[in-house]
């Protein structure tokens, strides 16, 4: 029953995925995981957003001196004044005067920017192009300043120039204003000051990089999220004509922002948002494939299949998406990154397992399990699979390539030295027997390391033999050295003894000579007497 449920779930995920056979693939350790749509994008349109850095606050008590507002304005002015000066400098350098040709003005302006990358130069030129719109928006600052709406349209005559945003106005309208109605001046000051201080901290984080050069430092997606606050979904819906949610757009990283105007008197900032043009490729799905080792024909093997495929009808192609942006639901690409697969690989993906190619694996540094949607797919013949709650060892028969484990059979699972808590579908083992031809198992780097391990083992054995021979030679050399030293000592002692004998012989001979001479002299003396 668990197997049927699992197959139904995967089949629903892959609805419209053509001839890809998830049930057959899971039998050999290939698990289809994420299924996404494919979209192509290019930068095309832009929108302007004016951000009111100071919310509209109507004090119900006349005569109150709200010092927190003055302090906030002074701090924000110090923080953003370098940005305003930088914007003015770049604008003056890049916008030609009447006496100066446009081309010459741009060249001189870019030279004034110093060393810059192509992206930075593009950002600077974009600043010039947006200057007219930013100026038109800031000319309506009085109308913008009077509104206390969190999001409002900026309209000149019948032309919509952009969207006015007050990131903290929602909080002011719903929380602060009702609270200060019954409060005194000090309480009002404290409440308003706390809100403004929090927003000031966020502004400091957002514009840290822009203080150096706003034209060359685009605003990040995280900064846009903080800057627009709770108004973000509304701003995206009003400014951009797209069916994609604000969360999806932000997670894609395709939205970029750039400061193009600033008015510190009214605390208003104009931001240009670049939005890509998106096109969906119909009837196409990008499917991720997670591959684990499987126990087939009494050996551990791994299927040789791509990690990501594109399925269009009955056509299956590899899709690395190396130059694409991937979100949980969509793959955004500038171009089609598909690669043609061999006939055998396509047949394998379609469920013909006799056409699949496998590689034998040796060692522990490989993938033997994968977790997806609260389910564990594991090769329990090649690793320890132990259920901790309830306590039991999970056995995988030789006829089963992989084992599927879920919470109905095991809540707490141990895989070798790792422990998991499973939260979701039934512990089931595929009972189908898969027979592979010898030609299906190929040695493919880097998965097949058996030959390399054999070579390493042989090298180790040879090294041990050489070490043993070295010990023998060393022992022989040591013995020979000891014998040589003793021989030298014996020769030296023998030589010294011989020299002593010679010296003693000479001395004795001299003494005998003297004695004989004295005796002869005494005999001659007696005879003459």
UniProtKB/Swiss-Prot annotation:
The membrane spanning regions, by residue number, are 488-508
Where on this protein are sugars attached? Answer: 65, 73, 352, 427, 431, 457
- The yes or no answer to whether the keyword S-adenosyl-L-methionine is present is no
The annotated region (Fusion peptide) lies at 103-127
Hey, which stretches end up on the Cytoplasmic side?
A: 509-529
| Cystine crosslinks | 64-185, 324-333, 348-356, 380-385, 387-410
Say which domain of life the source belongs to.
Answer: Viruses
* Record's keyword annotation contains Hydrolase: no
Q: Which UniProt keywords apply?
A: Cleavage on pair of basic residues, Coiled coil, Disulfide bond, Fusion of virus membrane with host cell membrane, Fusion of virus membrane with host membrane, Glycoprotein, Host cell membrane, Host membrane, Membrane, Signal, Transmembrane, Transmembrane helix, Viral envelope protein, Viral penetration into host cytoplasm, Virion, Virus entry into host cell
Q: Where is this site: Cleavage?
A: 102-103
InterPro entries from the xrefs? Answer: Fusion_F0_Paramyxovir (IPR000776)
Question: What are the boundaries of the signal sequence?
Answer: 1-19
Single GO biological process annotation from the record: viral budding from plasma membrane
Name its cellular compartments.
Virion membrane; Host cell membrane
List each coiled-coil range.
128-156, 452-477
Give me the Gene Ontology terms describing cellular component.
Answer: host cell plasma membrane; membrane; viral envelope; virion membrane
Q: Which residues lie on this side of the membrane: Extracellular?
A: 20-487
| Topology term for the membrane | Single-pass type I membrane protein; Single-pass membrane protein
Free-text description of this protein's post-translational modifications in UniProt? The inactive precursor F0 is glycosylated and proteolytically cleaved into F1 and F2 to be functionally active. The cleavage is mediated by cellular proteases during the transport and maturation of the polypeptide.
In the record, the note on similarity to other proteins reads:
Belongs to the paramyxoviruses fusion glycoprotein family.
Q: How does it assemble?
A: Homotrimer of disulfide-linked F1-F2.
Summary of the function given for this chain in its UniProt record: Class I viral fusion protein. Under the current model, the protein has at least 3 conformational states: pre-fusion native state, pre-hairpin intermediate state, and post-fusion hairpin state. During viral and plasma cell membrane fusion, the heptad repeat (HR) regions assume a trimer-of-hairpins structure, positioning the fusion peptide in close proximity to the C-terminal region of the ectodomain. The formation of this structure appears to drive apposition and subsequent fusion of viral and plasma cell membranes.
Q: What is this protein called?
A: Fusion glycoprotein F0
Q: Which organism is it from?
A: Parainfluenza virus 5 (strain W3)
């Amino acid at each position: 029953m668990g197997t049927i449920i699992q197959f139904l779930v995967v089949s629903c995920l892959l609805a419209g995925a053509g001839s890809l056979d998830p049930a057959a693939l899971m039998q050999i350790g290939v698990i289809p995981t994420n299924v996404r749509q494919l979209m192509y994008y290019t930068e095309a349109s832009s929108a302007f957003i004016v951000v009111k850095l100071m919310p509209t606050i109507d004090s119900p008590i006349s005569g109150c001196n709200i010092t927190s507002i003055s302090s906030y304005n002074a701090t924000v002015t110090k923080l953003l004044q370098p940005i305003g000066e930088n914007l003015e400098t770049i604008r003056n350098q890049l916008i030609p005067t009447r006496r100066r040709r446009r081309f010459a003005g741009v060249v001189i302006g870019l030279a004034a920017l110093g060393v810059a990358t192509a992206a930075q130069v593009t950002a600077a030129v974009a600043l010039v192009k947006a200057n007219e719109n930013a100026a038109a928006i800031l000319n309506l600052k009085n109308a913008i300043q009077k509104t206390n709406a969190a999001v409002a349209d900026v309209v000149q005559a019948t032309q919509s120039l952009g969207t006015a945003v007050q990131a903290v106005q929602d909080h002011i309208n719903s929380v602060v204003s009702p609270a200060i109605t019954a409060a005194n001046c000090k309480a009002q000051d404290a409440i308003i000051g706390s809100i403004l201080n929090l927003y000031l901290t966020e502004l400091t984080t957002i514009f840290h990089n822009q203080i150096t050069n706003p034209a060359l430092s685009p605003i990040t997606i995280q900064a846009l999220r903080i800057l627009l606050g709770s108004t973000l979904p509304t701003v995206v819906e009003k400014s951009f004509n797209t069916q994609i949610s604000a969360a999806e757009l932000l997670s894609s990283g395709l939205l970029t922002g750039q400061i193009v105007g600033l008015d510190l008197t009214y605390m208003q900032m104009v931001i240009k948002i670049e939005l890509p043009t998106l096109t969906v490729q119909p009837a196409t799905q990008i499917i991720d494939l997670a591959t684990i080792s499987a126990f087939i024909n009494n050996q551990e093997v791994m299927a040789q299949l791509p990690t990501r495929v594109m399925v269009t009808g009955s056509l299956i192609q590899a899709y690395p998406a190396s130059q694409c942006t991937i979100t949980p639901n969509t793959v955004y690409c500038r171009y089609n990154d598909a690669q043609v697969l061999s006939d055998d690989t396509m047949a394998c993906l379609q469920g013909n397992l006799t056409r699949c190619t496998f590689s034998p694996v040796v060692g522990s540094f490989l993938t033997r399990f994968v977790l997806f949607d609260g389910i564990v797919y594991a090769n329990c013949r090649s690793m320890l699979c132990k259920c901790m709650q309830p306590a039991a060892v999970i056995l995988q028969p030789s006829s089963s390539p992989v084992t599927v484990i879920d919470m109905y059979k095991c809540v707490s699972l141990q895989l070798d030295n790792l422990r998991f808590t499973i939260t979701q579908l039934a512990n089931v083992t595929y009972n189908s027997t898969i027979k592979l031809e010898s030609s299906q198992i190929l040695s493919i780097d880097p998965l097949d390391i058996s030959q390399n391990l054999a070579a390493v083992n042989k090298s180790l054995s040879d090294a041990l033999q050489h070490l043993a021979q070295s010990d023998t030679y060393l022992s022989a050399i040591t013995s020979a050295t000891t014998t040589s030293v003793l021989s030298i000592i014996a020769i030296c002692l023998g030589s010294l003894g011989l020299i002593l004998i010679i010296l003693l012989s000479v001395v004795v001979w001299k003494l005998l000579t003297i004695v004989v001479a004295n005796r002869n002299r005494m005999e001659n003396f007696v005879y003459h007497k």
